[in-house]
């Protein structure tokens, strides 16, 4: 038996602060509860006046009944507030089912992408804004919230909107159920719920100090620029450009971060230099991370829900939410302990005296605001060069696998293979290592000059050398280049003929089913491409097209792909499966994971319990499906998070 659920809720806390913070707020309540058992009609309970039926409550506690919702993580979180001891293991998420098929993340967009007869009620946004969000009081209406009795007709519409959401969710589930991922993915999803519910403790003393010091720094920089420029608002790009054009004697095209950095590297007047330095201070967007932490921290002193399961299209990797752990600034300071204490003292002058750039210190300390509970420490372990290891394993590029087996430096080995000379880090031909590193990061998925330039952001490699480096890298890695071609050929053949194709690399299977092109990974998980077809690319050559999210425009429509891109999807997906499997093993060994970032796991453990060495051993254990893949990890133990 299945029970499909959708809830409408109210909270004074904005949902953008995170679902856990939203539900944690004392004003949170479930307004409407729509449900349907199996094929029964959808019922809606108005929880502002009626309790849930006993049959529904019993089902919430019954482990034999599967509970489903479109964004089940939210429904589970809401119901936990009312029924903390109910069953939260036999839940399935229809949104994850859609994401597994590389469909959009929202109910409305999935129904449109699948071209279902059932559609989400378009009145929803207006009704949510009216009943589920606080209103601004006015002189004529001092109320801070709209209640059902304030607008009975709208409330009736809201009930129907809630009902329709379950109708659409059930239609989506019915369409996609035969494409369910392997059972292990449900275990990964449940583990993801545990990690998000557990959350990470925040050092609020550090966060508050960072925000206070930043306010002082911004005020000082603003006043300084006002005096130097005479501008009323020196943070206005238009006003500042006019002033700079007059002082420099030529027109600046743009005022991006890179433009400011390039100007500061030149011989410019001292007042211009100071104004540009102030501009950098005023443009320090990293401070928003501290504000996000302050807004998201819950009553238990922790931030929850920072990871989105299957958040990355096609690869299935996790995506960041709330604080966006995936793009936290790096730290380079040698003594983080001292820097943290000075920041907590809120002494901006001392920060300036010790480090020369208080704003940069605040930026570097963002990671350290995430701390372990008293009596605990973080064990942080990160897979080493996992994508390079995975692509070498799949492509059977033996010399690369030998490098990893011997514990070598892949950047040095790559440069040595390209230039046919020994290369040692800080040793013989050490200057070539950087070229090897850039090539490794840029060329693994068919990238060319553009990819090299993007990876070599500082322009350390002369442009005239790039074509030669690209050619040398490809000649040194013929099995990887063959992987691109084989993936491209297999996908096109399947789309053209409808017949399945296996390629030698990883014994990966390409096949077509129910309107999707599927790529079956070694783990058994599948990558999906909706409505695949063949078309012509901008060069006039045959290309693979499918319906998907345009990552630039963020719209659903035609997307083009090719062999190198398919290999990137495959490699990143295999790396994701390695991480997921390792986290499940760690959890079964008793380790409490509080976060993970890219290929790194963050564990909170009591002091004296567990060890980094054991964590690394568990992470690098092989699975039956990745035999021969040489994994390695490194890490550290510390009372706060940082980049080692």
Where are these regions (language model features)?
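A common structural junction motif
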Residues: 617-627
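A short acidic-Thr-Gly-centered motif at the start of a beta-strand
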Residues: 1, 58-61, 361-377, 584-588
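Conserved pre-motif C helix in the palm subdomain of viral-like polymerases
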Residues: 164-170, 564-584
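Active-site-proximal helix-loop-helix substrate-binding element of RNase H-like nuclease domains
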Residues: 24-35, 39-177, 334, 408, ...
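Short, conserved charged micro-motifs
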Residues: 608-614
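Active-site palm subdomain of RNA-directed nucleic acid polymerases
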Residues: 176-188, 578-598
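Short active-site loop/helix that positions an aromatic residue
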Residues: 11, 73-85, 99-101, 241-248, ...
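Conserved "right-hand" nucleotidyltransferase catalytic core of DNA-directed polymerases
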Residues: 1-9, 13, 32-34, 113, ...
